[in-house]
UniProtKB/Swiss-Prot annotation:
NCBIfam families: rpsG_bact (TIGR01029)
Any one GO MF annotation of this record: tRNA binding
Domain of life the protein comes from: Bacteria
Function per UniProt: One of the primary rRNA binding proteins, it binds directly to 16S rRNA where it nucleates assembly of the head domain of the 30S subunit. Is located at the subunit interface close to the decoding center, probably blocks exit of the E-site tRNA.
Biological source species: Gluconacetobacter diazotrophicus (strain ATCC 49037 / DSM 5601 / CCUG 37298 / CIP 103539 / LMG 7603 / PAl5)
Keywords, ordered alphabetically: Ribonucleoprotein, Ribosomal protein, RNA-binding, rRNA-binding, tRNA-binding
Lineage: Bacteria, Pseudomonadati, Pseudomonadota, Alphaproteobacteria, Acetobacterales
Name under which the protein is recorded: Small ribosomal subunit protein uS7
Amino acid sequence: MSRRHRAVKREILPDPKFGDVVITRFMNALMYDGKKSTAEGIVYGALEVLRRRGGASADPVVMFHSALDNVKPAVEVRSRRVGGATYQVPVEVRTERRQALAIRWLIDASRKRGENTMQERLSNELLDAVNNRGSAVKKREDTHRMAEANKAFSHYRW
């Protein structure tokens, strides 16, 4: 165990347009080389596309949170060595990590898509996630499937 103090969690300010902390986290994860304004443009553009595609009653922030909830994993597997053998042990995912994984998976899935601009890719991936399809949702399902397959080793939890 480390002898140092645990790092204090930094407070993240809500984004200027919607006043949502999760959207700021998403922007920070999307950002390359400290280019926050570029990341902001991409996220706000994608949310604008969601608003246009969703119809008059569609709130892009609600759709964004819905997409995120559909990608959040409940369980994951972690490697555990027991007597020379390595087991994939299913463990429940903490709330913060759930959110972090969902954000990371959405961004990775968006970057791998074939559309021309990142704005299009992100908006399409978010729409797919809202409708429970797409690469990010598939990643969550694969993670759950892996945990289900290794349920027998759940007594090795720590």
